[in-house]
Amino acid sequence: MNIKSELNYSNGSNDSDIYNEYGGGSGDETYNKSDTVDFRSKVIPQQSNLPPINNKTDRSHFRESMVASKKTIGAFVISDIAIGKGAFATVFKGLNTLSGDFVAIKRFEKSKISNEQHSSVSTEFDILQRLNHENIVRILGREENENYIYIFLEYMENGSLSTILNNFGTFPESLICNYVENVLKGLVYLHQEGVIHRDIKAANILINKAGEAKLSDFGTAGEIIKESDKRYSVVGTPYWMAPEVIEISGHCQVSDIWSLGCTIIELFTSYPPYFDLNPLGAMYRICQDDRPPLPDDISSELANFLERCFCKSTEERATAKELLSHPWITKNRTNLINHQRNSSKQFTSPQIIINNHQKSLLSNSSGGDDSVTDSDLSISNQSSRSSSFLLDDGGGGGGSKNHTVILTKQQPTPDQIEFNKMQMELQLLRLRVGELETDLKKEQDLKKDSDRKYREILLSSMHYIYIIDSTMNTITNSGGQSIKPQISNDVNHLRSIMRDQIETEYFQTFPDDNMVPRFIQRRFTHVDQANMMIPKKALEAQKRREKEQEKLKEQEKLKEKKKEKDIKKEKDKKDKKDKQLKDSSSSTTTTNSTPSTPDHSAFHSSPITPLSPVRENSKPFLSLKGRSSSKIFNE
């Protein structure tokens, strides 16, 4: 056997010796099993850098430790990553094992919170559970064990405004306005639901990955039944407190507006008003000053907005709904829409650049091909506000010329921008209406389908019951005689109960339809009614309807009679009044025609009672002796 070895070992002999030992020297020799080959090498092999097979790396050890330390609370897995920490709770990042979404898990340690703080946790859960708004953090659940209380919340990727402020510095006015508009929408919903937040500040406003602001931390929130109601407790953070809260004159809905104004100054300057003072000094200044000092370099609209927020009187202070229509909000909203429209135009409005490299294409003087190739026409997406025509001679009259023609639209006027904006909003509303109509139609179809199936089930049950009744009423024997089958009382009672239940369900579900189903009516025509069990509920319903119709007819008749009586009474009253007027007019004419004589009969007929004699010492008259005439006159 000829084996050609290509192994290159260094063992003291050359490659040809090894090759010949395998019988490859002459090509005719065969391999002998007794021959030995020495593969010993003088070179010591080095240790390999590759890891051994099935060896566990540090990463695998890390995963094992993660699996061992994994904490599962209900359907959620809590990690060791703390994304926030407050006075009473720590917030961790978690995973929803059902949906795969990240969640925020707020953990309260029972040993470190008082009974009052425990009630605030329950209040926060109860309030968040019944709230549902796009600018309020959603609650996903609650769990509790011996040591901790867990509240599962919507995960906000960008964190709080306070964290963003610490990482990126103060915000521009336009961005602050966007966040404030979202917060105002959430406050409008809260106040409509009878809830006041009572702790509005940057740390309690969270931002998701879409840049939308949402209110969070409802541990100090309170509920009010009416807008005029107030909560008489000092709750909140001192620098953001409204004066009526500090003075314990009542915490109301517009107290959140004062805190919102302080939050705007916080986002603009990194600190709330009076932050250079201690909390007690700040609270004193809040109550004594007319309003907090406003930052410099703010627009007049924002200054007016803050003045509306910082009105000392709660009756004069603006509400969240009123501030949503403030010029500072509406102007920024318009600017944002225009900016988005212009940025979209930058990619959708192309400039057509026509490059003509041949002079004949412009002058059309030569007889060559006048077609424009793909290289002569190019489209650029660079936006420009002016149109230009550039001519570049390549030298001399016969040189080539490059012409660049930029075609752009004229800048739209403000009226056109407003019109386009309204058109866009109208189109969005139409799309939304169409979606709602489609959803409504689907729901109506589903309801009709479910009603149809339900009715079919009821009708089938009734059909089955009446088939049993008809077969058990009469049975024809071999001699052609009709006999009644003998059934036990229990079976008969059970059959009656089932029939009554099904009939009641059917006639209560479909009261306006035909009372007797068609298959029963058909059986009435084929079977003798004397031997047929008529549906009791159907007859009762029909009788009840007939009585109601008769009652309605009687009521209508009574109404007509009453109306006729009223008309007749009014007519009699009017006739009587006219008659009295005629009589009075005739009597006045007779009295004017005849002279009247004085009648003294009443005077003569009335008896005259004589005056009783007055005694000297009797009351009320006293003796006049020794008294002057002036005194007597004065008396």
Curated annotation (Swiss-Prot):
Its EC number is 2.7.11.1. GO terms for cellular component: cytoplasm. It catalyses: L-seryl-[protein] + ATP = O-phospho-L-seryl-[protein] + ADP + H(+); L-threonyl-[protein] + ATP = O-phospho-L-threonyl-[protein] + ADP + H(+). CDD domains: STKc_Cdc7_like. Pfam families: Pkinase (PF00069). It is an enzyme of class 2 (transferase). Residues 77-329 form the Protein kinase domain. Residues 540-582 have a biased composition (Basic and acidic residues). Belongs to the protein kinase superfamily. STE Ser/Thr protein kinase family. This is Probable serine/threonine-protein kinase DDB_G0270146. It comes from Dictyostelium discoideum (Social amoeba). The lineage of its organism: Eukaryota, Amoebozoa, Evosea, Eumycetozoa, Dictyostelia.
